[in-house]
């Protein structure tokens, strides 16, 4: 059995819960959120999926647990509290891996603080930007002629700029093999 902790039960956290419940693995899932409204959203969304393993369990709490072993923690809180939540989690629990939603933090100093916390606790952190793993992007990267400048344009509507732009920036960074990018606005 794997111990899964999801911190933040709102829109993203409840979707992570649905995905976890589809797993064939036996999971002990704990969902934490101080908002009863968010807990209610998570409960409702959990009831919409058929468990991939009938032995998996879900519990809901308002506080981060203490003195627990956690295989995977998904931190899907608002960015302005994410570093505080991470510190509270890692100072009182043993966590093997953490998946962070993006944008990670609101202050530059919090990046260094969390990296140090991850190192000190021997936890591995991941940022939820999975497009690099898609076979289409892997094949595209192999076909790109990187001897010339590469331009990318993204069009769309009804999606949050900050939430979704990071995915396109990340995939472009992956495709060109650089993390230093120049952005231009188009109207």
Predicted regions span which residues?
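Short, well-ordered alpha-helices that flank and scaffold nucleotide-derived cofactor binding pockets
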Residues: 14, 18-22, 44, 87, ...
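Short acidic low-complexity segments
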Residues: 54-69
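Beta-strand-loop-alpha-helix segment that lines the small-molecule cofactor/substrate pocket
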Residues: 67, 71-132
């Amino acid at each position: 059995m794997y111990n899964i902790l999801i911190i933040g039960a709102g829109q993203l956290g409840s979707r992570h819960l649905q995905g976890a419940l589809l797993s064939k693995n036996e999971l002990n899932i704990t969902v934490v959120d101080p908002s009863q409204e968010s807990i209610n959203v998570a409960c409702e969304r959990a009831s919409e999926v058929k468990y991939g393993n009938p032995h998996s369990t879900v519990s809901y709490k308002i506080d981060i647990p203490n003195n627990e072993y956690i295989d995977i923690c998904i931190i899907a809180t608002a960015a302005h509290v994410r570093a505080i939540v991470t510190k509270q989690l890692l100072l009182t629990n043993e966590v093997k891996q953490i998946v962070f939603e993006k944008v990670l933090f609101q202050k530059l100093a919090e990046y260094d603080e969390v990296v140090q916390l991850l190192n000190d606790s021997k936890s591995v952190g991941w940022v939820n930007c999975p497009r690099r793993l898609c076979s289409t992007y892997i094949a595209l990267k192999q076909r790109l002629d990187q001897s010339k400048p590469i331009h990318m344009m993204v069009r769309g509507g009804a999606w949050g700029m900050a939430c979704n732009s990071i995915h396109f920036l990340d995939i472009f960074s992956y495709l060109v093999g650089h993390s230093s990018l120049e952005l231009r606005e188009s109207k």
